[in-house]
Amino acid sequence: MSFFRKPQKVITDDAKIRELLTRGVERVYPTAGALEKELLSEKCLTLYFGIDPTGPTLHLGHAVCLLKLRQFQDLGHNVIVLYGGFTAQIGDPTGKGEARPQLSAAAVKKNTSNYRKLIGKILDLKKANVKFLDNKEWSNKLKPADMMAIASRFTVSQVLERDMFKERQKNGQEIYLHEFLYPVFQAYDAVTMDVDMQVGGNDQTFNMLAGRTLMRKMKNKEKFVMALKLLVDPTGKKMGKTEGNMVALSDTPSDVFGKIMSWPDSMILIGFELCTKVPLNDIEALKASLERGENPKHLKLRLAEEITALIHGGSEAKKARSGFDAAFTEGKPQEFMEVRLFGKEIAEALMEKNIIASKTELRRLLCEGAITNLDSNTKMGEEFLKTAPPGKYRIGKHRFIKIHGSDTD
């Protein structure tokens, strides 16, 4: 099945292909050399990145993969953004010690409503070589006999090789049958779209390789897999929605800038590599300057401006930097984000504004003493979860809010 009218003319520039194969790349299957040969052959490849719509926004972790798609798009290759409208209702067990809650079709539809706009911040949606698809379009049509035919291409022992399943068995935890089927149905996406390649984070390697296996068995065709490095904090924890340290693509420019500035210095170089378009040679120069003893804050300011510009444009990034400088050089924040409770809990109100990613993050910030009432200069405790008095607050180092108890105060 082809979703593109005709192959595009592709660019085979050695330097651009070299950067494509190395920047942010953990591993290529079967090999980087085999993929390089394809890229130099002037063949127009079709590749995809899949997103399970488990939340209403996208974050920098998604941006890492979208930036890689943009590199392929700029070379003339066809790229597909695949929504997991079907697989999101199963729930990806990747990295989970327990089963994910299954989403309803209505929840999935609501979550994807803003995705295209956010993805358009990184991909060029005006070009003909980008498509948006949803796996519910074919997976919802599968009959029981079709499902059995697909599932018969895999063995139980293959699926049990997953690290998280081994861990659950070791701990005596349940593994549900629908979780076994997740990589099977995701693999079927690649076969249905007849793609040449899939891009994703290296935590998705098992799922992506399942697609490679199914492609060989059903179509006798090679499917390349590009596993990308993950954006992780110094403890190795992935930056994302579930982890409570998310930089959302829907965040305001000042919030994006402030959140990046709160990153530890150890994330500066990997942040440049994964989340910006700064050339690799320039990143090497930045690394050398750090080794010579340059103040990391100077580089982090540039990183924050680069990432904010990627999401919101250069003009908004400059304004965000000016606001940051005013807040932390002069001690006067230029703006407070307005938060109106209207009877809602503070956690819900803050999540709606993308100030925090989850109630877990808010609880962690309170435990760390990272939320301060600026009117009384007091740190907030657990009681803030239930009763958040109107006033001005600092959350962490770089987020400022003004809480209104009602629409009249």
Segments (PLM) and residue ranges:
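A charged helix-plus-loop insertion that forms the helical arch/lid used to bind
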Residues: 93-109
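N-terminal catalytic cores of NTP/NDP-binding nucleotidyl/phosphoryl-transfer enzymes
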Residues: 31-93, 199-205, 211
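Conserved nucleotide- and phosphate/pyrophosphate-binding catalytic cores
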Residues: 215-409
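Short, hinge-like loop/turn segments at secondary-structure boundaries
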Residues: 96-101, 149-152, 242-243
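Short, conserved acidic/polar surface loops in the N-terminal third of protein domains
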Residues: 90-95, 143-145
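Positively charged, low-complexity intrinsically disordered leader regions
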Residues: 2-46
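Divalent-metal (Mg2+/Mn2+/Ca2+)-assisted nucleotide/phosphate chemistry catalytic cores
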Residues: 24, 104-105, 109-112, 116-227, ...
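Short acidic-hydrophobic, aromatic-tinged amphipathic segments that line or gate anion-handling sites
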Residues: 29-31, 133, 337-342
